[in-house]
C-alpha cells in the first residue's frame, strides 16, 4: 500500500444482498488479543468524491491508525448502488454482516475505531465477540 505496510485483502460475498465486502488485514490476528477494527460502510459519493469533507480519506486515516497499532482489520462494507440513508433494520443487518466477517477471521476481542463516542452495537455476543475498548477516530 502507498500508505504503508503489507496488507492482506480478503473478499466476502453476501449471497442474500449480492454484495461484496472487503477486509484489509495488517499483521496476525489472535483470538486472545484485542484486535483493532474499523468498520467502514463505503459510499462513493462521500469517500471517493469528497462531497462530505469529514469523510474524505477516512479509509486512509483508518489504515494509518492500524499501522501505528502494528496490526488490525479494516472492514469495508459495500453499500451497493444505494445512495439513500438506510433505516434502522438495515443498520442492524450491517452489524450482523460485520460480526459474521470478524467471527470468520477468528476475532474474539475488539479494539473498535469509531466516530461515535459510545457506539451501540448489539448482538455481538451471539458471534462470540466483545468490544474491549473504543478509540475515537
Q: Model segments located where?
A:
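Catalytic domains of riboflavin
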Residues: 1-137
